[in-house]
């Protein structure tokens, strides 16, 4: 007799699509050197002291600090936010999940502004919430009036990526304040803060509904160690700390973050290099008649293909050892996203694109 395990699975997850992550470099079938431009990582890598600390680390047999006390102290110095308002997690993804677990009852609504970071929708639906999409305009700007019209008594959260991923679009502090003035708990995702220098931290005392997320994956070269943090009103930080699994920031990540914060000026210099390279990449991409690059304030550039198929271009680049992200969702049909790497990475990408356009 066949045992039917499926009947025990949550019915709302039967058709859950899951998340399509970037392909791991070791899975790419090519003999060429990989240029990885698909996940918005810092290709300069971690600070030298981080690499040294990881090479010398010998405490893997010990559980990490469950409260991340030293990391939070260093982050308090960095952000100017009190230690008790800071919560660390396994990437900002975990904090998104925890926020939704904390706020959402089945059927509660979350306002989302697509195209945007896919994990807002992913975790909302995983936690039995209802996504209410308020699409951006043709330039990928947020429609604040439409957000206001979408609010109902069931609205529990609004997610705003500042700047937006995957479009790179900026949003002004005044626009964010207009959203906060609507009175709904609002999560401002500042994953790319170090590339813009714009933050809502100074507004936290004025807006008790403001929550800020950040990550070490983009600017600090630590994507593989999965560390993010959030800045929250004290009551929310307390609740999140209660429901968060205690050892979510592993001991190697803990050590790496400590070194990163001590060497942050070094890492911020690499950020400056990436910002400069972003402008060069945008200028050069604009010269291809078949590509339309969108302005970006992050560490990537989104391009729409004016002719040809994005998926085919992605595959052709992969065959040359260059990994990029392809999008074909509503409002992002036939688009590619290029992370900004080192100058030699840009050179390799431009050379490959030039050969394809010949």
Curated annotation (Swiss-Prot):
It comes from the Bacteria. Keywords: Amino-acid biosynthesis, Aminotransferase, Histidine biosynthesis, Pyridoxal phosphate, Transferase. It is an enzyme of class 2 (transferase). Its cofactor is pyridoxal 5'-phosphate. Pathway: Amino-acid biosynthesis; L-histidine biosynthesis; L-histidine from 5-phospho-alpha-D-ribose 1-diphosphate: step 7/9. It catalyses: L-histidinol phosphate + 2-oxoglutarate = 3-(imidazol-4-yl)-2-oxopropyl phosphate + L-glutamate. Its EC number is 2.6.1.9. GO terms for biological process: L-histidine biosynthetic process. One of its GO terms (molecular function) is histidinol-phosphate transaminase activity. The modification N6-(pyridoxal phosphate)lysine is found at residue 218. PANTHER family: HISTIDINOL-PHOSPHATE AMINOTRANSFERASE, HISTIDINOL-PHOSPHATE AMINOTRANSFERASE-RELATED. HAMAP family: HisC_aminotrans_2. Belongs to the class-II pyridoxal-phosphate-dependent aminotransferase family. Histidinol-phosphate aminotransferase subfamily. Homodimer. This is Histidinol-phosphate aminotransferase. It comes from Dehalococcoides mccartyi (strain CBDB1). The gene is hisC.
